[in-house]
Swiss-Prot record:
It comes from the Bacteria. It comes from Clostridium novyi (strain NT). Keywords: DNA damage, DNA repair. GO terms for molecular function: ATP binding; ATP hydrolysis activity; ATP-dependent DNA damage sensor activity; mismatched DNA binding. This is DNA mismatch repair protein MutL. One of its GO terms (cellular component) is mismatch repair complex. HAMAP family: DNA_mis_repair. Belongs to the DNA mismatch repair MutL/HexB family.
Amino acid sequence: MKRINVLSEETSNKIAAGEVVERPASVVKELVENSIDANAKNITIEIKESGKDSIKISDDGIGIHPNDIEKAFMPHGTSKISLIEDLYSINTFGFRGEALPSIAAVSNVLLKSKTMDSDFGKEILVSGGRINHIKDTACNIGTVISVENLFFNVPAREKFLKSDRRESSLISNIINRLALANHNISFKYYTNNKKTLMTYASSDVKNTIRSIYGKNIYENIISFEEHSDIVSVYGYIGNSEISRGSRNNQSIFVNKRYIKSGTITAAVENAFKSFSTVNKFPFFVLFVDIYPEFIDVNVHPTKSEVKFQDERIIYKVVFDAVHSALSTSIKESFNINKDSIFDDKDTTYNLIQDETPKQEQVQIPIDLQNKRSDSIIENLPKFNPNVSYEKPKDSCRENCLNSIDINLKNTTEELKTKDIYYENSISASPKDNILCEKSQSKNIDNYNTIEAKFPRLNILGQFNKTYILAESLDTFYMIDQHAAHEKILFEKFKNQIENRDVISQILLTPVIIEMSAEDFAYYSENINIFHESGFVTEVFGDNIISIREAPMLLGKVSTKDFFLEIFDDIKNMGNGNIAKIKHNMISSLACKAAIKANHTLSYEEMNSLIEDLRYIEEPFNCPHGRPTIIKLTLKEIEKKFKRIQ
């Protein structure tokens, strides 16, 4: 029968060391964090043979009191906390008092330290957890600690270390993160007496980013910032040019502590998805400042994870900060001149019609997916790109109206369900129309408050039945008609769902769906998502539901397929990801309903599409991240033709 033994102090110390000291990078992290806690302004790290032979950390901090030198190597000896309640208001990196004794248990440690009030410093040598000597020494204010022969008494641990190159890479990685988190401190890092990194104290982390990652990263990052009552989020995110296939260049700091957080990473990447190609991960350096009582840092031996009291708040603040910054950055790149939104500075565009209009205003639907609309516009004058379109006079409007025979009753009744309305399409020239899907739900006066996100464009034509070509001043534009229409519909559907304005239509024949017991339970738990999306359902039997009404915005999309698509997202992502589920749902619907590539558009349809795009909230990327519109300046084109250098 096996008996219970009490482990010796030496054995228990080695076991405890295994929790804190996994590899040389762990030692560097713990010692540099101690220097930061000591209010150091300059920290030097010197590594030899990937840290296996020697690790030396020097700082100019406040030092260790001479009488506390020995206590520093005792288990749970710390100056950071004294009561259990202090755990809920921690503002330092260390607090357990485990680092130094754990490191000393598996290596030879020489520490020298001096405080400002002392005439001389103290030196202590600890080998394998045992103190060899403590004596006075001459040294500068601050602390110098050398760790040699790491794992000399634990050969099994040393055997599992990676190659020297890999271990050095891990050390560099942790030093980079510590330098980013503490950009107000100067860092010097030497590997085998060769300078590897040097940063200078700066109030802006962007300067430290340049020192670590280089000029290319520095020139392609965008700042973001968001605040709430309990948390502030700020930092930098890279644009799509520097996105990568891995998450290696992502850094999260909570109260300056480098951590890994699935919640924060998901928030950033979901915000980034709308502006970049799929399967790419963004570069970002993100700081979260939060009251200590709202987090728990004592949930992981290496403190690499924290627990938030309310992860939903954190997710929302991070998502909003990143999404807003990316959206603003793309918008600013188009350099819209508010003084010349309507092309001609000499012409004041009047959104409100004359008090005594010459003709009654009509709305003619233009179906971008159905050629039925061709019969409505077939008699329109052909568009000539060589002719400049000026605002017509009233007599011209009357002539245009009188020249085309339109049965208003039939037009409105037969095509009243079409998506896009082209107001005064018969009589108006391009400068007379605001062709926007918002016209279905907002009156003309409201357009005065809607800001155009890019200049009014002069349409040149269509290329490959897929891309609309246009110009404005000295800039050439190309618009992907599918991506543009998809984003217009996405914004429209999103607004309807968010505002709970989704109109449902009764199905002629209810759709019956049989489910397993597990699936039916998922459905029951998340029935509100379906109701908010415009579905009206009822239980039709054991694990059977009947869809009585479906959202009108579905159009020709299969009701059953779309319902099951939402359901699969709920199962795969969990009901904690409601925002992502709704985003996927709306983007999928918009993609299916939008006009496709290889579809010929008339001038009026192209103009209508572009005008709709100008006035939506975020017009520059489709929901899947592809650009809707790209531009080339005259200068860029002339460079291509070698006209200029």
